[in-house]
Amino acid sequence: MELKDYYAIMGVKPTDDLKTIKTAYRRLARKYHPDVSKEPDAEAHFKEVAEAWEVLSDEQRRAEYDQMWQHRNDPQFNRQFHHSDGQSFNAEDFDDIFSSIFGQHARQSRQRPAARGHDIEIEVAVFLEETLTEHKRTISYNLPVYNAFGMIEQEIPKTLNVKIPAGVGNGQRIRLKGQGTPGENGGPNGDLWLVIHIAPHPLFDIVGQDLEIVVPVSPWEAALGAKVTVPTLKESILLTIPPGSQAGQRLRVKGKGLVSKKQTGDLYAVLKIVMPPKPDENTAALWQQLADAQSSFDPRKDWGKA
């Protein structure tokens, strides 16, 4: 397997801080999101970026990855993990590979009683739109085979067709019984756990079962009221902006949030007032007329008061 350069994938340097890496991740997630991007292989790029973020966003896993990267040319690393098939290292292999190289205790060579196989965890990226209904997914992972000393001797690729239920949430674990590593001496197999990762969406933020979307409006739309088209996970809707709306005001759209077995969340449109470009002479005169008509209005009247 080939150890991927996660820093290069994210377009950052190994010395960059988490804030810089997060900024790069959000930019790339927006760029390659399949619902938005028209670039070829957008989904593959998106998943690769999500995989890099999974490791680099975690302080411990990032430190372990950095150590692995430093040792990538060591003979021990090459013998165990650089196979001729050109298969790439990914985040699903991370914990097994690191512990195998840097600290897993050798197993005792004497005969052991029947023992249950190890569980395996892999992360499955799910788009927000996919959480609305049950969908099928083909997943691939590697079953590690250990030698008598507890070292990974080889990895056997395995593919499964699974169903991801509707309403899955971020961090939810789905158990696939018996799909982990084989047991020892007649013991039962371990399980495979699918850990759901809800991929970031370029428009929606998740707040519990609800969704938030920032809706840009003009000053006159906020002042006079308007109807604007707003996307949801299923379709676009016509949202009514009431007269006198304020920046940051949250408008609730019932039943347009996330779906679960117990409830359906809501969508909250957060208004963002966007000013037009620098006004020309005529436009400036109109703004001045408005200012004169509202001369008694002081937006800072209650500023700083409890």
Swiss-Prot record:
The alphabetized UniProt keywords are: Chaperone, Cytoplasm, DNA-binding
A Pfam family cross-referenced in the UniProt record is DnaJ
Q: Where does the UniProt annotation locate this protein?
A: Cytoplasm, Nucleoid
Q: Which part of the chain is the J domain?
A: 5-69
Provide the Gene Ontology terms for cellular component: cytoplasm; nucleoid
Tell me which SMART domains the record gives: DnaJ
Q: Which GO terms describe its molecular function?
A: bent DNA binding; unfolded protein binding
Q: What is this protein called?
A: Curved DNA-binding protein
> What species does this protein belong to?
Shigella dysenteriae serotype 1 (strain Sd197)
* Phylogenetic classification of the source organism: Bacteria, Pseudomonadati, Pseudomonadota, Gammaproteobacteria, Enterobacterales
